[in-house]
């Protein structure tokens, strides 16, 4: 009986499957939550300042140091864009560790999906934590169009990047903006990008 009790008390220590998508942290739709904060905080500013970071997988100590450092600069930075690769293998636990660290930021951030984040069912975990893989937002008169460009991880079986989404965003006239920044993890010409379509980005 004692042995059985010990086993039962240790059940929470068992990871049933590395690609179990059931999250144990409360964060959901991080981008959907933070984008309105970014837009509201910058609406009266003449100049916007943002930090681009990424590829933080397995670099938990360094990411913690980054968060501590960037929090000392919070009065001079409006928001952060994480360019993806929170994980090495797309595992739920990796996502949770990364998001737990990033949740300590005093500055709102948005997250793109990286090629490592797609592995297994990592894209599904990303969708739960951050929202859609393709999204946009406007800061002052600058539109940020954020794309999933990690074609190789889908074996080119999905339309990645989604040119339908990109076209709609670039033709959108419902809100005023004068400049556009297209943000992505895998750049045109990289091995993760579908280079059959890279000329579109020239």
Language model feature labels by segment:
Residues 1-11:
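Sec-dependent bacterial lipoprotein signal peptides
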Residues 11-97:
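N-terminal active-site segment of His-dependent metallophosphoesterases
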Residues 39-51, 136-146, 171, 175-179:
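Beta-strand-turn-beta hairpins that frame and shape the catalytic cleft
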Residues 46, 59-66, 83, 94, ...:
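Stable alpha-helical elements in mature extracytoplasmic
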Residues 53-56, 83-85, 112-116, 147-150, ...:
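Active-site-proximal beta-strand/loop segments in catalytic clefts of secreted hydrolases
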Residues 58-62, 88-94, 116-121, 152-155, ...:
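Active-site environment of divalent metal-dependent phosphoester hydrolases
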Residues 64-134, 138-139:
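Core catalytic region of metal-dependent phosphoesterases/phosphodiesterases
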Residues 71-79, 154-202:
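His/acidic metal-ligating clusters that form di-metal
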């Amino acid at each position: 009986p004692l042995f059985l009790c010990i086993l039962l008390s240790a059940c929470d220590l068992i990871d049933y499957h590395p690609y179990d998508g059931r999250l144990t942290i409360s964060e959901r739709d991080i981008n959907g939550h933070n984008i309105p904060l970014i837009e509201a905080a910058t609406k009266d500013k003449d100049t916007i300042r943002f930090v681009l970071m990424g590829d933080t997988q397995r670099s938990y100590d360094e990411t913690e140091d980054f968060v501590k450092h960037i929090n000392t600069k919070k009065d001079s930075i409006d928001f952060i864009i994480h360019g993806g690769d929170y994980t090495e293998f797309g595992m739920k636990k990796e996502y949770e560790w990364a998001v737990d660290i990033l949740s300590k930021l005093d500055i709102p951030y948005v997250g793109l999906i990286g090629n490592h984040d797609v592995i297994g069912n990592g894209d599904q975990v990303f969708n739960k934590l951050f929202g859609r893989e393709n999204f946009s937002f406007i800061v002052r008169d600058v539109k940020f169009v954020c794309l999933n460009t990690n074609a190789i991880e889908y074996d080119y079986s999905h339309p990645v990047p989604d040119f339908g989404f990109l076209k709609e965003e670039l033709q959108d006239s419902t809100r005023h903006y004068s400049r556009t920044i297209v943000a992505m993890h895998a750049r045109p010409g990289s091995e993760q990008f579908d280079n059959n379509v890279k000329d579109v980005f020239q």
